[in-house]
């Protein structure tokens, strides 16, 4: 039990070390120039929102990195699913009430679908992940460019209802908690997580991989 607690404390310290050091460094640079990193509530809202964006992207990327693979298509998946969700929502509700919720749900669904397509291409084609992900990236970016015609899509769909979701740190914090809870549940308490750990650690025994 003591070793487990010690390992937990070590992981927590290791996780917080880099963000804390970066925050101290950035604050020092800001203070040197007579500024502060977060000067008002709007700044704090934006800070938490972008923490959520970077954290979720990092979690998705690390799933492949841990198993020795690298997926270049994450950015194109996120961009395409977001644009599809925003444009469809705006075409149906015209920026009215519940636009943010509908856009969130559609974006998640499109993200899952695009991820499934990418995974199936890797499984069916039997090509190295770097080649598959680069191909998927080019395809998704081509579709994205065709839909938007190279224009900044937010100028078309931006309105108070659809942007209110990111206007407060509370929503971003909720998303962070939900994503962490879902990831812990999937990778620690499901058969998928069990199989993932077996592949990740390449132990002689699946039982050993799960316990490690």
Stretches with model-predicted labels:
Residues 4, 125, 129-190:
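Transmembrane helix-bundle core of multi-pass membrane transporters
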Residues 13-17, 47, 76, 101-109, ...:
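Hydrophobic alpha-helical transmembrane segments
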Residues 23-31, 40-93, 120-126:
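Single transmembrane alpha-helix segments in multi-pass membrane proteins
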Residues 94-137:
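Alpha-helical transmembrane segments within multi-pass membrane transporters and channels
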């Amino acid at each position: 039990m003591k070793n487990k607690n010690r390992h937990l404390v070590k992981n927590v310290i290791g996780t917080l070390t880099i963000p804390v050091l970066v925050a101290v460094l950035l604050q020092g640079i800001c203070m040197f120039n007579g500024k502060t990193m977060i000067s008002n509530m709007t700044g704090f809202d934006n800070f938490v929102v972008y923490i959520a964006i970077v954290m979720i992207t990092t979690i998705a990327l690390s799933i492949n990195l841990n198993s020795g693979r690298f997926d270049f298509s994450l950015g194109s998946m996120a961009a395409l699913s977001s644009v599809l969700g925003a444009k469809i929502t705006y075409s149906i509700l015209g920026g009215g009430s519940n636009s943010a919720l509908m856009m969130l749900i559609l974006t998640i669904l499109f993200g899952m679908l695009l991820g499934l397509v990418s995974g199936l291409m890797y499984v069916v084609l039997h090509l190295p992940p770097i080649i598959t992900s680069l191909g998927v990236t080019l395809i998704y970016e081509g579709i994205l460019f065709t839909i938007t015609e190279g224009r900044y899509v937010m100028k078309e769909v931006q309105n108070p209802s659809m942007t209110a979701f990111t206007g407060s740190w509370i929503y971003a914090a909720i998303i962070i908690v939900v994503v962490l809870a879902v990831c812990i549940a999937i990778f620690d308490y499901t058969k998928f997580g069990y199989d993932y750990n077996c592949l990740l650690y390449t132990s002689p025994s699946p039982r050993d991989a799960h316990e490690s």
